[in-house]
């Protein structure tokens, strides 16, 4: 499939259509939020206030995050760690940080295509990094890297924090892509509905291991462009998919939120 066709498919698949229901994160009011140049409708008033009040009605016992080691035997195999060797860390004053990759999570949606957040593949100036700097370790768990793919084309979807990445290798030989949910399926989400995800969050001083999350739907943002959830979300999980219980369709991408470093006095 050509890149232009992929983008049209993504748009038609509701990640960025006029009736878009796309991405987002929701957390406790006690911690700081990620700051970047992308517009976050979930942070706008009064959406933030109403979502917070609703989130307080959802018990923290309904949320979970745990190391996941069985992706080789499941549909979650299509998810992996995205590495950006020319990301925001290149602008750090700390030499050790400059040597690190900027990273996030991606999901295979086509034989040669995965999707992630645009801020994951951005350079320090907010532009898409060249394809040669982007790679995808599908199904990675720590030092176990069964599949390593190289980007051939990186496309940022206009007016959204979404990127479509084309790969040199045919990932479809190794995994079945996960489809993007329809508008109708996304709009069927109700308050406190369970959503599932797998990503590569910063946990125990490491961002190379896969973690499985259970999160809860709170509401759609004011302009209908974002899914607000109550979640245990950490840096590195950006771009991870919001999935149904069968892991068969993507409602959106986990993108931003509070307590990204997990150091808030609030548990989540």
Region roles according to the model:
Residues 1-29:
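Sec-dependent N-terminal signal peptides of Gram-positive bacterial secreted proteins and lipoproteins
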């Amino acid at each position: 499939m050509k890149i232009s066709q992929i983008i049209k498919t993504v748009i038609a698949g509701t990640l960025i259509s006029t009736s878009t229901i796309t991405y987002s994160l929701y957390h406790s009011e006690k911690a700081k939020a990620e700051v970047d140049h992308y517009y976050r409708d979930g942070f706008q008033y009064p959406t933030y206030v109403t979502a917070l009040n609703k989130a307080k009605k959802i018990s923290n016992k309904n949320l979970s995050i745990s190391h996941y080691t069985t992706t080789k035997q499941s549909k979650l195999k299509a998810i992996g760690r995205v590495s950006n060797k020319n990301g925001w860390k290149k602008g750090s004053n700390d030499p050790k940080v400059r040597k690190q990759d900027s990273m996030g999570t991606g999901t295979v949606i086509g034989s040669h295509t995965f999707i992630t957040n645009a801020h994951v593949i951005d350079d320090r100036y907010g532009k898409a990094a060249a394809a040669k700097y982007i790679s995808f370790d599908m199904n990675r768990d720590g030092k176990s890297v069964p599949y390593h793919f190289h980007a051939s084309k990186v496309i940022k979807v206009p007016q959204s924090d979404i990127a479509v990445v084309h790969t040199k290798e045919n990932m479809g030989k190794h995994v079945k892509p996960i489809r993007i949910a329809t508008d109708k399926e996304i709009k069927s989400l109700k308050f406190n509905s369970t959503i599932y995800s797998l990503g590569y969050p910063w946990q125990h001083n490491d961002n190379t291991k896969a973690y499985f999350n259970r999160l809860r739907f709170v509401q759609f943002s004011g302009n209908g462009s974002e899914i607000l959830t109550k979640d245990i979300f950490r840096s590195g999980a950006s771009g991870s998919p919001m999935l149904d219980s069968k892991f068969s369709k993507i409602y959106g991408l986990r993108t931003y939120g509070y307590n990204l470093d997990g150091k808030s006095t609030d548990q989540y």
